[in-house]
């Protein structure tokens, strides 16, 4: 999109360096703001920066699945009115599709917390939510004005 600007967060040093290299090679330094660090810390610093430059039309969350509610709460604070928040991997390897398969110890907490997050979203009358089954699931959440 002409005139669009992207702010993205990377916590892995090697991926950050790789992203910097790609952004430079594509000449997109003026349009992509790459931040290094833990997403919680970076988001909290953006929330404290109360300028319009730190408010977004679209936010994409792809983070620790058991903490999506916390990331969503931060994303909502950073959103412009009417913004869209997209959450990736909402079906957690298919465990949230109603299957009776036990997710096992490794995924049990993530599955429980993701179910709680989905219930929270469904209870919010000020949101329009679409859950898409593509890939590992996407939630497209529109903040109603």
Spell out what each predicted region is:
Residues 1-145:
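S-adenosylmethionine/decaboxylated-SAM
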